[in-house]
Structures are given as C-alpha cells and as structure tokens.
Amino acid sequence: MLTFVGLGLYDEASVTVAGRDAIAAADRVFAEFYTSRLIGTDVAALEAHHDTTIERRDRAGVEQHPEPILDAAADGDAVFLTAGDTMISTTHVDLRMRAADRGIDTRVIHAPTAASAAAGLTGLQNYRFGKATTLPFPWAHGADGVPGSVTDTIEANRERGLHTLVYLDIKVDHPRVDGDAYMTASQAADLLATNWDADALGVVVARAGAPDATVRADRLGALADADFGSPLHLLVVPGSLHHIERDALRELAGAPADAL
C-alpha cells in the first residue's frame, strides 16, 4: 500500500489525525520538500513528533527514479509526505499511477492547502477564483520581467470577474542560489507593478497556517514597498468584488477604500 499524506501548511502539528495515524502505521516513510516545505518545522522535528524515520527524496528520486518508494509499497505499507496536499498544485499523480501499474493499492489523505487558506484568510469567495498561475524568478525563466503566460492568466480571469491565485516561486537546491530561495510577496508585487499594472489591487497572504499569518491588501505598487516577513508568501489579484468581499478586504486585510 502507498498512502499519500499531505502535511498541511505550517508545522508538525498541521497534519490531520488520519494522516498522523497513517504515518504511525507505516513500515517506511518518504517525503519530498522541493515543491514546498513546512516553514514552522524541519525533518528532524517531524521525525521526533511522529516517532519515525523520514527518507527524503529529491525531484529525481520521485519523478525519475521512484523505484525505492514503489518497492517499499509493494512489500509493505509506505507513506509519501509533502507539504500542503500531495495532489493539489504540484500533483504526484504520476507516482500514484506508477504504483497502480504495479498493482499496488493507493490512497490519499488530504490536508489544507494554500488555495483553501487564501480564500479563508482573505474573505474572498472560493468559487470566484479562476485559473491559478505561478510567478517565477526572472532568472529562472530565462528572461527579464514577467512571463506573458502569467499576465495573460490574470487578465483572462479579470475579464470574467474572477480572482487569480499567484503562487510564488520556490527554488530548493538550485545551482543558481546558495541554499533555498523563496520569492516574497513584495518581490512579486514589484514584478507585476513594473511589468503589468502598479495600480491594480493585490492581496498578500504570508505564512498561511502559522500563528502569525498575515493578510494585506493594497495596490501592487504599494505592496512592492512593504515587508511581509518570513516565507511562505502568495499573492491574489482580485477580479470584480462582491460587496461582502470588499468589506472583508477592508476589515481583514486593511485595504484602503480608494483601492477597492
């Protein structure tokens, strides 16, 4: 059996009870943290909390050479961990299908995600979000500024009155950076303000799931000059706003009245 367990948003306590029980029952526990990570903890603390050993896999070890994971699942109960939910945004459906091809039973234990937190923390209605996009570091996509696909997605959503969830780039063990690199919301706002529309409304969500989670709404040009603290950050570019959403952004995110 191969069980996919989402760890939630922040630390070792963010996992669901069902996820915790699956980890406790597993013969072997694998994890990847190259797509995202739990900022409030580390692997050692996770191991101590769950009284287990976690075998960390890099991208190649999951996407190109998953045999150790699959072999463990064929021989017993294996668990595969990620931050957030294993099947949302960066999906591991390929690993699940490889297991199915080998006749290995699978199951998924879901967890809170950045997408659900963005709606819950900002007061924006979740069914009014359109297609999401990811804003990469300029050096990562090989050009200056913002890829056209990002602004095209935002504009297409806005034409339909929909909000855009903008995931911000994460680089783990990348040869261009020393350590891990996390795009901040102010960097993202600056890129969009410079290359798209400085007067457009943006909503920052910083450290969703943490005790000090922060939400701030303002024009992109103003957000570019702000400091939102430690990662992880994401950015929402709203479409048309329901009057309840306007009230929520004023009360929950400090949005200036003239920016709404």
Curated annotation (Swiss-Prot):
Pathway: Protein modification; peptidyl-diphthamide biosynthesis
Enzyme Commission number(s) of this protein: 2.1.1.98
One of the GO BP terms on file: protein histidyl modification to diphthamide
Keywords recorded for this protein, A-Z: Methyltransferase, S-adenosyl-L-methionine, Transferase
Alphabetical list of InterPro entries matching this protein: 4pyrrol_Mease, 4pyrrol_Methylase_sf, 4pyrrole_Mease_sub1, 4pyrrole_Mease_sub2, Dphthn_synthase
Taxonomy of the source species: Archaea, Methanobacteriati, Methanobacteriota, Stenosarchaea group, Halobacteria
One MF annotation (Gene Ontology) recorded for this entry: diphthine synthase activity
Family statement: Belongs to the diphthine synthase family.
Function according to Swiss-Prot or TrEMBL: S-adenosyl-L-methionine-dependent methyltransferase that catalyzes the trimethylation of the amino group of the modified target histidine residue in translation elongation factor 2 (EF-2), to form an intermediate called diphthine. The three successive methylation reactions represent the second step of diphthamide biosynthesis.
Reaction equation(s) it catalyzes: 2-[(3S)-amino-3-carboxypropyl]-L-histidyl-[translation elongation factor 2] + 3 S-adenosyl-L-methionine = diphthine-[translation elongation factor 2] + 3 S-adenosyl-L-homocysteine + 3 H(+)
Keyword check for Metal-binding: no
Species name: Halobacterium salinarum (strain ATCC 700922 / JCM 11081 / NRC-1)
Name the record gives this protein: Diphthine synthase
